[in-house]
């Protein structure tokens, strides 16, 4: 399950800072929220997403069906009709959330690696509110033509692509 709680004493006891707070109090609350956010993203497992099997993998038979030799049957069906990829794989419920980190949330051009927490965050929104699985993909490329080529090459994997936080006009 993709849920967690922020257990910051400040947030639980005092709520959000009011507009009437002194600047010292606001800074203290901001620092406490920052620390709570860092802990939220780090514990108990770093990040906000994971990959979980949808099939039982309890014994040798399950493993043989999931991989070799059983996996050959759906592969052959997809060769016959590529639309079968939606029938036999997660593709139909899998979206790529892709960014190069050039225009992130008011943070600006922070690059692909630093944008990863934001893309994971977008992924958990897809999962929580639409039950859609997401892979976040951060690409170290700013040339628009190369970026398009990279993203287009990923098409066989995903049922959808969400471009996120790519600066204009490159995002168009």
Across the structure, where does each feature detected by a protein language model lie?
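N-terminal ligand-binding/catalytic initiation module
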Residues: 20-172
